[in-house]
Design a protein with these regions (language model features):
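Periplasmic c-type cytochrome electron-transfer domains
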Residues: 4-7, 11-13, 22-396
Length: 396
């Protein structure tokens, strides 16, 4: 055991060795014969490709056309919690992204707008500021684009922008806030979405609370022995680093894994109806959308058959608080997720060549799950709902 500790050492020097920006699967594998043997079995392209290192998150990127300010963030927070930004004033952002449930909703699949039933798991908005593509299929490229897609999406908020805008104009506190923050006379939805995006950029992991980040910054005692072994597996035999890399622990690419369908596909008429209707809305040929139960993922964006079943790699940060997992919400524990990958994923036509059986031992599975938990903060990011202003009639 002492030899193992000396081989990996501690602190920044270890991170530099294990997670250098030019790190390749071959370089990671040199830590031991077993790991090297596993690396030789990886696809040649993967062996040659440079892998971005895991590490603490950098400063949040802020677009030049939507600078941050405390007042804008506070306005965005209010709007995030306000149910009036939705069709029937019952579906605010926070319904599907609850602070007490890891900023997801804790359900296998999202509830959907009243009268519909979603068919995908509601992803956490924690650290969403770092994504260059959002939603499971990557259909938008910024938080400013994500907010209207959710508020106006017909299975999410289903809000009409002109109606939502008028609601805001009948709330004097919002009128005053929009004037102060944006310099406009009346609330406009474009600026409302900018404020929500600014608020979401504050929902990020605190490196001081994340064991792995503390380790990467020099605290050699931040990870226990099981987590240290799990880190070696992550970067070697298990190959997690191939897709879950960089500070976000996501390559932000799209892969087909063969994740099992949720039972709602088989048992919920409303889910089946909504899914088929959405396939029609997304331009799936009529010959297919009426009968196809499969969630086609990236295909809805590209219409390329080779993209059927591919979904964006989610971040592995804050996994302790964001169960259930996968786009269908079928796994409730990290152990189940590790077992799925250990089996080599599931069956799907466009399956990623990176997903293969791992032959992990029971102890290795425990160690890997332990390291995955070390990518989460010690305590969840909780937040109380702010007081929301009431409507006021216009004076005549």
């Amino acid at each position: 055991m002492q030899a193992d500790k000396l081989s990996i050492r501690t602190g920044v020097a270890v991170v530099a060795a294990l997670f250098t920006a030019t790190l390749t699967v071959d370089a990671v594998a040199q830590a031991g014969r077993a790991t090297a043997k596993r690396a030789e079995q990886k696809p040649a392209a993967a062996q040659k490709a440079a892998i971005p290192p895991l590490g603490p998150l950098p400063p949040v990127p802020v677009p030049a056309d939507n600078p941050m300010s405390p007042e804008k963030v506070e306005l965005g927070k209010m709007l995030f919690f306000d149910s009036r930004l939705g069709g029937d004033a019952s579906s605010p952002c926070v319904v599907c992204h609850q602070p007490g449930k890891g900023w997801g909703d804790g359900d296998e699949i999202s509830r959907g707008y009243p009268g519909t039933q979603h068919w995908r798991n509601s992803q956490t908005v924690l650290n969403s500021a770092y994504y260059n593509k959002l939603f499971w299929e990557g259909s938008v490229t910024s938080l400013e684009g994500q907010a209207p897609a959710a508020a106006e999406g017909n299975v999410a908020g289903n809000g009409d922008p002109s109606l939502m805008e008028m609601r805001l104009r009948f709330i004097p506190e919002y009128v005053a806030a929009f004037r102060k923050v944006f310099g406009i006379e009346q609330p406009r939805m474009t600026q409302a979405y900018q404020a929500i995006a600014a608020f979401q950029r504050t929902l990020v992991s605190d490196a001081k609370q994340v064991p792995f980040d503390r380790y990467a910054m020099g605290d050699g005692k931040a990870l226990n022995e099981s987590q240290m072994r799990g880190m070696q597996l992550y970067n070697g035999k298990a190959g997690c680093i191939l897709c879950h890399n960089g500070p976000l622990a996501s390559d932000q690419k799209f892969h087909a894994l063969g994740v099992p369908d949720n039972e709602a596909f088989k048992t919920s008429p409303l889910a089946q109806i909504t899914h088929r209707w959405q396939q029609y809305q997304k331009g799936v040929p009529e010959a297919n959308y009426r009968d196809a139960p499969l969630d086609r993922g990236l295909y809805y964006v590209t219409k390329n058959p080779k993209d059927i079943g591919k979904f964006r790699t989610p971040s592995l940060r804050e996994l302790k608080y964001t169960a259930p997992y996968m786009h269908t919400g079928v796994f409730y524990t990290l152990e189940e997720v590790v077992d799925f990958y250990d089996r080599g994923g599931g069956d799907t036509p466009n399956k990623s060549p990176l997903v293969k059986p791992l032959a992990l031992s029971a102890q290795e599975k425990k160690d890997l799950a332990a390291f995955l938990e070390a990518l989460s903060m010690d305590k969840p990011l909780l937040m109380d709902a702010p007081p929301l202003p009431a409507y006021q009639p216009l004076r005549r």
